[in-house]
Curated annotation (Swiss-Prot):
Location within or outside the cell: Cytoplasm
GO terms for biological process, alphabetical: DNA replication termination
Keywords: Cytoplasm, DNA replication, DNA-binding
InterPro entries for the chain: DNA_replication_term_site-bd (IPR008865), Tus_dom1 (IPR036381), Tus_sf (IPR036384)
GO terms for cellular component: cytoplasm
Superkingdom per UniProt: Bacteria
Organism phylogeny: Bacteria, Pseudomonadati, Pseudomonadota, Gammaproteobacteria, Enterobacterales
Family label: Belongs to the Tus family.
Protein name per its UniProtKB record: DNA replication terminus site-binding protein
Keyword DNA-binding: yes
């Protein structure tokens, strides 16, 4: 597919996403609200995106106002939806849950529109991250040339429906994204960045080429069978633990935006018990089990690329 067809399809899918999000807003707004609880987190200011987070103060909102905030959040996809002092590199987060009473017909209608919405989100992410063929540092320019001010992470995030949950409780998760990669994978990625011939701030084009060339040399010097890992820290994330009494099952969900709980009262479903998200303090985090990690040597800091050392 040529570039212009790709851009046209991206714009078309985004327009469809806006329509389905509006339809979802209308559908949910018409349903009887039985409970709503959302947790507002501090905004991340420009220039502070990469600072380690040690404390997060949580503000709770309940009832109709929580529902209003939650429904608005699903449609906050652009930079102009937030203050000028807020970082464009950090996605907005509003953990929580909105609980609605539904008939069988209403449940099917809502599930259909959520499924369609999530399919469009996944297709947009695939167009931008895979089909464009662009390395990550060039996607920003590609997206903002055609959808100016789009917050891609907010756009990609899927909407999570819950059917007759017994309880929804909240907490925090600290983790790393760890991925095994090959020497060839990394060289291909670096060469794609080099051949693109563009500058990536704060570097000039020449400085950027020099940096990438040095990284390529470092990787090429490794033996072919070297075990490589990308170990990228993920900032602390809100999560939800959902309990289903009948199935005796707990499901954990990432919770960057409100979950949508549908309660079928005519089938005897009760209002789920809702927990609270407490303030985060890194000093109070306790690990149930932390296995010994294999020793690693940092090779390419920009990519969080490590060489696994033999014990």
């Amino acid at each position: 597919m040529n570039k212009y067809d790709l851009i046209e399809r991206m714009n078309t899918r985004f327009a469809e996403l806006e329509v389905t999000l509006h339809q979802l807003h209308q559908q949910l707004d018409d349903l009887p609200l039985i409970a709503a609880r959302v947790f507002s987190l501090p905004e991340i200011e420009k220039g502070t995106e990469h600072q380690p987070i040690e404390q997060i103060t949580v503000n709770i909102t309940e009832g109709e106002h929580a529902k209003k905030l939650g429904l608005q959040h699903f449609q906050r996809l652009f930079l102009h939806h937030q203050g000028q002092h807020v970082s464009s590199k950090a996605a907005l987060r509003l953990p929580g849950v909105l609980c609605f009473s539904v008939t069988d017909k209403e449940l099917i209608e809502c599930q259909d529109i959520i499924k369609k919405t999530n399919q469009l989100k996944a297709e947009l992410e695939h167009i931008i991250t895979v089909e464009s063929g662009l390395p990550s540092e060039q996607r920003f320019e590609f997206v903002h040339t055609h959808l100016h001010g789009l917050i891609t992470l907010n756009t990609y995030r899927t909407i999570t429906p819950l059917i007759n949950p017994s309880s929804v409780r909240f907490g925090w998760a600290n983790k790393h994204i760890i991925k095994n990669v090959t020497r060839e994978d990394i060289l291909l990625q670096l060469e794609k960045s080099l051949n693109a011939g563009r500058a990536v701030p704060p570097f000039t084009r020449e400085q950027w080429r020099e940096l990438i060339s040095l990284e390529i040399n470092d990787v090429q010097r490794l033996p072919e069978k070297t075990r490589l890992k990308i170990k990228r820290p993920v900032k602390v994330q809100p999560i939800a633990r959902v309990w289903y009494q009948e199935q005796q099952k707990q499901v954990q969900h990432p919770c960057p935006m409100p979950l949508i709980a549908f309660c079928q009262h005519q089938l005897g479903a009760e209002l789920p018990k809702l927990g609270e998200l407490t303030d985060y303090d890194v000093k109070h985090i306790k690990h149930k089990y932390k296995p010994d990690a294999k020793p690693l040597r940092l090779l390419v800091p920009r990519l969080h690329l490590y060489v696994e050392l033999e014990p």
